[in-house]
Amino acid sequence: MTPSSITTYYVVDAFTSEPFAGNAAGVMVCGGGETGDTCLGPLARPDDPATLPIMQQVAAEVNLSETAFTWKAAGSAEYAIRYFTPTVEIALCGHATLAAAKVLWGSGAVPSSEAIVFRTGVGGQELRCALEGGRIKMVFPDDQLDAVEGEEKAELLSAFGWSGDVLVLGAYKGRLN
């Protein structure tokens, strides 16, 4: 085994204080890539689109419902974060965000007295995490909801197996749907 084939990742059980309970998420804390020292290999920059297939491969190998990759954004106090299932990148994952914050505080990368600001890779949403009274408070952005009408609404009703005799008062989607 060569040193470049050794990678550290965390498995965090979110929403619980009990081992093997809650909702597990994988977390990898990556360097920013300035020195070539990252979690993704010697020359892989986590903010480079060319590394997305590597992140996808790692998430498939970890094989949890979601794996979060996070790194300190260049020239910023924020942390970038991307989320992958074993098969696809997703825009947002609450329990993986919680898990990433827990790892950053627990490893000492961020003092527990400081809030963490994450910026998502898909959609560029800002997420904030802070420790308050021994619990993690997460603040997610409000999303603008748009009404779903016409053919799109009919497709949605069909997907749920609902017929015309079901009264739907409204259907909405967010900007990332």
Question: What positions do the PLM features span?
Answer:
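Active-site proximal loop and beta-alpha junction motif in alpha/beta enzyme cores
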Residues: T2-L92, L98-N177
